[in-house]
Amino acid sequence: MSDICDANKLKYRFRGYFPVVIDVETAGFNSQTDALLEIAVTLLKMDNEGVIGIDKTLHFHIEPFEGANLEPEALAFNGIDPTNPLRGAVSEKEAFLEIFKAVKKAQKASDCHRSIIVAHNAAFDHGFVSKAIERCDLKRSPFHPFATFDTATLAGLAIGHTVLAKACIMAGIPFDNKEAHSALYDTERTAELFCHIVNRWKSLGGWPLLAVDEQDAQSDTEA
């Protein structure tokens, strides 16, 4: 792909995948048995210069599914009280129907053919999202069934640290540990980190890739 204008379109940047940044807060580590309590989803956009940034964020407090396990240690860690009526929690199905609607609309607007989850330690978030979708018997999920972009891995390569707070600070992104472990806060910081890495790679000349014929021509010139 030699056309720079095309290279600056989101649909070409990730092979037709639309990146969706997600963070979940849960009542444990087991996606099959432990409750999903909170989810935030950040949608991204790319400008005419090929710079990726945050578009908007959706945020939901989730009612534990029937029979869900609630690990006291997990609740103490994230500070969530599932019984607090002020949470304004909704069912998993209600939340994911809204998420599907927003993601599919943004995916279509970017002319992408599928969405891919971006998360910090993505296997964890992807597992809880996938299991919730399965419990709700929702069809035609916009998300790839197994592929993800893991910002812990990307940050380890690009910045030299895998912890979200440390990686953000090293990238010049403010991070307040008092706000951490809120799905809304962590999702937006993860989105900023992902965008920083992608944009930094572009600024260093890593994207767009030269087409094969351009590489050959450049090699001939240098020779």
From Swiss-Prot:
One of its GO terms (cellular component) is cytosol. The keyword Transferase does not apply. Residues 20-194 form the Exonuclease domain. Its EC number is 3.1.13.-. Binds two Mg(2+) per subunit. The active form of the enzyme binds two Mg(2+) ions in its active site. The first Mg(2+) forms only one salt bridge with the protein. Its cofactor is Mg(2+). One of its GO terms (biological process) is tRNA processing. The keyword tRNA processing applies. One of its GO terms (molecular function) is RNA exonuclease activity, producing 5'-phosphomonoesters. It holds the Pfam family RNase_T. InterPro entries: Exonuclease_RNaseT/DNA_pol3, RNase_T, RNaseH-like_sf, RNaseH_sf. The record marks 29, 77, 124, 146 as: Important for substrate binding and specificity. Keywords: Exonuclease, Hydrolase, Magnesium, Metal-binding, Nuclease, tRNA processing. The active site is at residue 181. Trims short 3' overhangs of a variety of RNA species, leaving a one or two nucleotide 3' overhang. Responsible for the end-turnover of tRNA: specifically removes the terminal AMP residue from uncharged tRNA (tRNA-C-C-A). Also appears to be involved in tRNA biosynthesis. Homodimer. Belongs to the RNase T family. This is Ribonuclease T. The gene is rnt.
